[in-house]
């Protein structure tokens, strides 16, 4: 049987590193279909830190796409697992027959599914991408994204799968000893990416709570984002006093980020699509409820796991937030499907499906 090849077709260092390390640590030892990777980006020590994997690096999307297409044409039994599919050339290859549906398995990351960019180039490309998506052999995604995808592509097979968020399961039962009274601290957004719509989110928080809460905005990723960070800072200072606005412009190490999240009382995410599962998982693990946009279908996954969900359209106050905290504290976090290690079973099944080992 031909070994499955995994494709990380865009240079997204943070997510690519997470996927590679997860496969190296959790999957490669037990499955030959979890070892072969083609990745856009620099090695930057990844080969050394992932010795169980065979990783081929490419300088850009186009060179990787050309190599994938060549392999697909040379052997029609060769199957590919695309982790987040932001590479236009690969979509066009699927549409034109360069890659066959039986070769194309896609794990939806969120941004690769929704059509939210307003640029002309994107507007022209979206219809072609939609046509190509009808030809995918199988999609893997969150419950909410599967539901969203099925509305336009009901005939494409869909399977539940969660991004392998880096988590320490031993923290599931750790009581959050933060004092749950007094001034609340609200986390706004999951990164410095513009998709978080930080300024609108800050205005929404201010409309709900005024200048009575402390707002923390993590913006250390992506790099070279100083102009936008300053734009958000100035908008924030028009709404909140300096002592109530904390904008983090430096990238935090994982443990420091975890400590930051545990100082919060609420997460506030205004984006109208599924994103930031990693941050949501870490907040939920710490007993911190989240406010989501109703257009973000991840609320379906949360309610399926009996987790409280607040919405940006709700009338929020401290009593409602404290009640959500109490509800979250009563949930057995060891049973949550999108937590580590529970998502591992979904990955083992996904590998078997993509490799053709199970129907």
Swiss-Prot record:
<keyword id="KW-0808">Transferase</keyword>
<dbReference type="GO" id="GO:0005886">
    <property type="term" value="C:plasma membrane"/>
</dbReference>
<comment type="pathway">
    <text>Bacterial outer membrane biogenesis; enterobacterial common antigen biosynthesis.</text>
</comment>
<keyword id="KW-0997">Cell inner membrane</keyword>
<dbReference type="GO" id="GO:0008417">
    <property type="term" value="F:fucosyltransferase activity"/>
</dbReference>
<dbReference type="GO" id="GO:0102031">
    <property type="term" value="F:4-acetamido-4,6-dideoxy-D-galactose transferase activity"/>
</dbReference>
<keyword id="KW-1003">Cell membrane</keyword>
<dbReference type="InterPro" id="IPR009993">
    <property type="entry name" value="WecF"/>
</dbReference>
<dbReference type="Pfam" id="PF07429">
    <property type="entry name" value="Glyco_transf_56"/>
</dbReference>
<comment type="similarity">
    <text>Belongs to the glycosyltransferase 56 family.</text>
</comment>
<comment type="function">
    <text>Catalyzes the synthesis of Und-PP-GlcNAc-ManNAcA-Fuc4NAc (Lipid III), the third lipid-linked intermediate involved in ECA synthesis.</text>
</comment>
<dbReference type="GO" id="GO:0009246">
    <property type="term" value="P:enterobacterial common antigen biosynthetic process"/>
</dbReference>
<keyword id="KW-0328">Glycosyltransferase</keyword>
<dbReference type="GO" id="GO:0036065">
    <property type="term" value="P:fucosylation"/>
</dbReference>
<protein>
    <recommendedName>
        <fullName>TDP-N-acetylfucosamine:lipid II N-acetylfucosaminyltransferase</fullName>
        <ecNumber>2.4.1.325</ecNumber>
    </recommendedName>
</protein>
<keyword id="KW-0472">Membrane</keyword>
